[in-house]
Every structure is written in structure tokens, then in C-alpha cells.
Curated annotation (Swiss-Prot):
GO CC terms of this entry: ATP-binding cassette (ABC) transporter complex
Listed name of the protein: Cobalt transport protein CbiM
GO biological process annotation, one example: cobalamin biosynthetic process
Pfam families on file: CbiM (PF01891)
Organism of derivation: Lachnoclostridium phytofermentans (strain ATCC 700394 / DSM 18823 / ISDg) (Clostridium phytofermentans)
HAMAP family found in the cross-reference section: CbiM
MF term (GO), any: cobalt ion transmembrane transporter activity
UniProt KW keywords: Cell membrane, Cobalamin biosynthesis, Cobalt, Cobalt transport, Ion transport, Membrane, Signal, Transmembrane, Transmembrane helix, Transport
Amino acid sequence: MNKKEKRIVAIAAAFALCFGISPAVNAMHIMEGYLPPKYCITWGILSIPFLVAGYFSIKKTVSKQHRSITMLAMAGAFVFVLSSLKIPSVTGSCSHMTGTGLGAILFGPSAVSILGIIVLIFQAILLAHGGLTTLGANTFSMAIAGPFVSFGIYKLCQKLKVNKLSGIFLAAFVGDLFTYCVTSIQLALAYPSSNGGVGASALKFLAVFAPTQVPLAIIEGILTVVIMIGLETYAKAELNDLGLVNGGIN
């Protein structure tokens, strides 16, 4: 590794030490066996096209910019660390940061689908977070829906000439919240309310998630901004390869 790559690895390691050390808890996104089989299969099938697009997106990026491999790994580590810090919220689920906004900004939302599913598989097998039967649902909410919204918000802020740091914050913040909107809908579809159906059930899940998820989304937005500032300082060449330093971060 050259000097800049070592600095990037050092930043990622320091971040993991600061935020990744936490007591082991039996928490997860949507836990193993919680969704009926038909919903597990449906969400898995819906995720497949995005994963295929993500594979080709990463392949194209790496073939054109070999230096991007380190940053791609760092974006994956960011997702792993943040999404492993969980706060129990409702039965069968929990609240946590997602970390996917950073990868969406750097590499686009399709690439993050691959990073996300890798993280979810590791968490399901090694940490007992989430599950293999609910992998499709968790992938769709955290690794697909959230990143696409984050990317859209970031591009919209660019078009509206919003301050770059503010745009990064909003992208991570809104993407995190949207992930939980999708999760609430997934849970509501599987367990509709006896009074009011899916809509009423979704509102109930959202109401329970909100007190913990809104503060976590704010924290994720701030952390994403801090990481981007660090990358602008120590990995400007890599960001330039990805077309992200026009005018600098201001």
C-alpha cells in the first residue's frame, strides 16, 4: 500500500476502534424466522436485479480505477460498523444506523447493494444479527432502498447548489430514515393490524421506530460528513478518480 492508502486504512481502523467496540447484544434488523416464507421469497426475488446491477457497477469501477478498491472496502467497513451498533426497538427488529449513504455517494446506489448483502451475510452468520431467511427483506430495505434515496438526495442537492456538506448530511440522514420506512412496510405487510390493515400497522411500526431512529439518523449524517472531510484531506486523488472533488468539500 502507498502512503495515502495506509492513511485511509488508519482512518477506518480508528473509526472502528472508537465506534465499533460495544457489548454483544442479541439484536438484529429483521430476525431469523420472523417473516412468513412467502415474504422472504418475494423480497429476495425483488433484490436480485439490483444485486446483478451492483455486481456490474463494482466490476466497472474497479476495472477503471484500481485505487478505488481500498475506498470500496472502507465503505463496506463503514456499513458493517454502523449497522452492528443496534438498539432494540420493536419485537422482531431493532434500530441502528445503516452507513450506506457514504457508499452511495462514493460509488452509486447499485454498488452498495453488494456491500450491503455481504455485510448482512456476515452479521447473520457471525453475529446472529438478522438472518438468512430474512436476508432478502433486509437487503431490500438497508442495501437497496436506503442507498437509492441517499443517492437521489445527494444529486438533488448538487442540482440545487446546496452546500456540499449539507447535501452529504441530508443524503445520509434521509436514506437512513427511508430504510426504516421500508422496514415498517415490510413488517406491516407480514403482520397487518386487525383494525386498519397494513396502513395502520405500518404507522404503528413507524411510531415505535421514530424515537430511536431519528437521533441515530442525525448521528449517521454527522459521521458521514466527518468521514468525507477526512477523505477529502487524505484521499483527494481517489476522490478525484470518482469525480467527487470538483470545487472541494465546502
